[in-house]
Every structure is written in structure tokens, then in C-alpha cells.
């Protein structure tokens, strides 16, 4: 596996990988790789000839009071895992490479980024869309793979890729979960043992709510019960629990397919997100 940090070297390496009509799948990450990330890499291997993984902890998607400095980083461990998975290339730029002096352009997907995590984390999705657009231009993949755990992010990237004519197939990978249902996340490492036990209440409440809504229960009442169950299970607060159109992300007061149950909640200093299909 090549580890590259320079854009000119990246372009040469990508050109070599594409010789003979070979295809490339990109898996963008912020590192601190876990089994969920590795499931994306394996999916990429199934759909393309070569897999490029990027590791970049993107400062522009963190708010001023968020965990950029504390976000876990262990490139040597991550690289070893990617070698085991047969990754062709690791793109690991630094902040100066991604955002050189004078950088002043950003991408905004206004409609899809305004609600849910966008409301709780102003500017977050502008940072995500901008860095992903740059990664697309740098790597020039045929396919890009993102986890479905951040459903809003996936919807935003799909819209951006369509609106800006990137010509890249955007694939979503199913959420990888622990045995008790908690979605795998690098931020799970922040949880104490007690918090980790309590965190199972989050996916449990969403699973119950998704089934109830699909079975015809009142949406508003079901969402309120889910919020109460999450807080009752040990969470400090709930940012949102919402039923949304799976494509447009429009909030739904009455169930119609395709729909997704979206949620974010806080336990201690950790903010967790999750979602489930409904129906």
C-alpha cells in the first residue's frame, strides 16, 4: 500500500492505478478506523479494482466548542489495518495541503444541510461538503462509499455529486453495529463503561419507534416516547428524533415511504447519531 501526502504524487499514483481501464473506489475517513470503516473498504473492494482510503481530520467541519483537538488519531494503526484489507493507496494529507494559505472557497448544500445535525452544528455540513468535493477532485474516483450511519451526510453528498456533475457513483454502506445495537463510531471511545452500557438505550428506542410508526402509530406521539426512552435510559439530552423523507430529508408528520428515522443524542461529552429505515 502506498501512503501519499503530496497532491502531485497522488495524481501520478492515481493515473498509474487507472491504467488499463481499472476503476477506483474512494473511502473518505477521518481515521480512528473501526470495523464499520473496514466494512466500507471491503465493499469498495467488491465494486472497484482499486481502493483508495483517505484519512484527514477535517477542521472545517468541527465547531469552536467541539472535539477537533481530542479526536482520536493513530495513523500507524490505521495504516496497518488498511494493509490487511488490501488497500491500494492511503491518501493522508495535512491541513496545509488541504487548505493552503488564502483558501476561501466552500461548498454549501443549503436545503439538505439546514435541519437536524446542521441545526445543532452550524457550518458542519459546509465543511463536510467542501472537503469531500476536494477529495473527489484530488482522487478522481469512479465510486465513493460512505456509511449510512450519517444519513444526512450521505444525502448531502449525493446531492452535491449530482448538482456539480462529479460523475461519481455514491454508494451507501449499511450501518455496522455492536451486539447490543449501538452503531460503531470513533466517538464511542469517549464513553465511560457506565455510559457505554447506557448507550444501548439509543438504538433500542429507535428500533421500537420505527416499528411502531410502520405499524401505524401516531408519529408525533411515537417520537416523543422515543425521546423519553433515550433520556430515561441514561442520556443527558436529545438533539432530535425525527421522521424524514429518505431522499429529501423533509420532516414527515405522517408516515410515507421511503422514510428514515433520524436521531442525535448526548451522553456526557459525547454526541451520538443513528438512523433506521421505517417500513
From Swiss-Prot:
**One GO MF term attached to the UniProt entry:** ATP binding
**Binding of beta-alanine, residues:** 61
Cellular compartment(s)? Cytoplasm
An example Gene Ontology CC term for this record: cytosol
Listed under catalytic activity are: (R)-pantoate + beta-alanine + ATP = (R)-pantothenate + AMP + diphosphate + H(+)
Q: Which residues make up the binding site for (R)-pantoate?
A: 61, 153
Q: Which UniProt keywords apply?
A: ATP-binding, Cytoplasm, Ligase, Nucleotide-binding, Pantothenate biosynthesis
Does this UniProt record's set of keywords contain Ligase?
Answer: yes
Q: Which InterPro entries match?
A: Cyt_trans-like (IPR004821), Pantoate_ligase (IPR003721), Pantoate_ligase_C (IPR042176), Rossmann-like_a/b/a_fold (IPR014729)
Residues noted as binding ATP in the record, renumbered to the chain:
30-37, 147-150, 176, 184-187
Report the EC number(s), separated by commas if there are several: 6.3.2.1
Instruction: Give a yes or no for keyword ATP-binding in this entry.
Output: yes
GO BP terms, alphabetized:
pantothenate biosynthetic process
Q: What else is known?
A: The reaction proceeds by a bi uni uni bi ping pong mechanism.
- Give the NCBIfam families listed for this entry: cyt_tran_rel, panC
Q: Which HAMAP family match?
A: PanC
| Quaternary structure annotation from Swiss-Prot or TrEMBL | Homodimer.
Q: Which family does it belong to?
A: Belongs to the pantothenate synthetase family.
What PANTHER family does its record include? CYTIDYLATE KINASE/PANTOATE-BETA-ALANINE LIGASE, PANTOATE--BETA-ALANINE LIGASE
Role? Catalyzes the condensation of pantoate with beta-alanine in an ATP-dependent reaction via a pantoyl-adenylate intermediate.
Q: What is this protein called?
A: Pantothenate synthetase
The taxonomic lineage of its organism, from the top, reads: Bacteria, Pseudomonadati, Pseudomonadota, Alphaproteobacteria, Sphingomonadales
Amino acid at each position: 500500500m502506498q501512503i501519499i501526502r503530496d497532491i502531485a504524487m497522488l495524481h501520478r499514483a492515481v493515473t498509474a492505478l487507472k491504467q488499463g481501464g481499472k476503476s477506483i473506489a474512494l473511502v473518505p475517513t477521518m481515521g480512528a478506523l473501526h470495523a464499520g470503516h473496514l466494512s466500507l473498504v471491503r465493499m469498495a473492494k467488491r465494486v472497484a479494482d482499486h481502493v483508495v482510503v483517505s484519512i484527514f481530520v477535517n477542521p472545517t467541519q468541527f465547531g469552536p466548542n467541539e472535539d477537533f483537538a481530542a479526536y482520536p488519531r493513530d495513523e500507524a494503526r490505521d495504516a496497518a489495518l488498511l494493509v490487511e484489507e488490501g488497500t491500494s493507496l492511503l491518501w493522508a494529507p495535512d491541513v496545509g495541503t488541504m487548505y493552503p494559505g488564502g483558501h476561501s472557497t466552500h461548498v454549501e448544500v443549503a436545503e439538505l444541510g439546514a435541519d437536524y445535525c446542521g441545526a445543532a452544528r452550524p457550518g458542519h455540513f459546509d465543511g463536510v461538503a467542501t472537503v469531500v468535493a476536494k477529495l473527489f477532485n484530488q482522487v478522481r474516483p469512479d465510486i465513493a462509499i460512505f456509511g449510512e450511519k450519517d444519513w444526512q451526510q450521505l444525502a448531502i453528498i449525493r446531492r452535491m455529486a449530482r448538482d456539480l456533475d462529479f460523475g461519481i457513483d455514491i454508494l451507501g454502506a449499511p450501518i455496522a453495529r455492536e451486539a447490543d445495537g449501538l452503531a460503531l463510531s470513533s466517538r464511542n471511545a469517549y464513553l465511560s463503561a457506565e455510559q457505554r452500557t447506557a448507550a444501548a438505550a439509543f438504538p433500542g428506542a429507535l428500533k421500537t419507534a420505527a416499528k411502531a410508526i410502520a405499524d401505524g402509530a401516531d408519529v408525533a406521539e411515537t417520537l416523543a416516547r422515543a425521546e423519553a426512552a433515550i433520556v430515561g435510559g441514561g442520556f443527558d439530552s436529545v438533539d432530535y428524533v425525527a421522521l424524514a423523507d429518505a431522499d429529501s430529508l423533509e420532516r414527515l408528520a405522517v408516515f410515507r415511504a421511503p422514510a428514515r428515522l433520524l436521531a442525535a443524542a448526548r451522553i456526557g461529552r459525547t454526541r451520538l447519531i443513528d438512523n433506521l429505515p421505517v417500513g
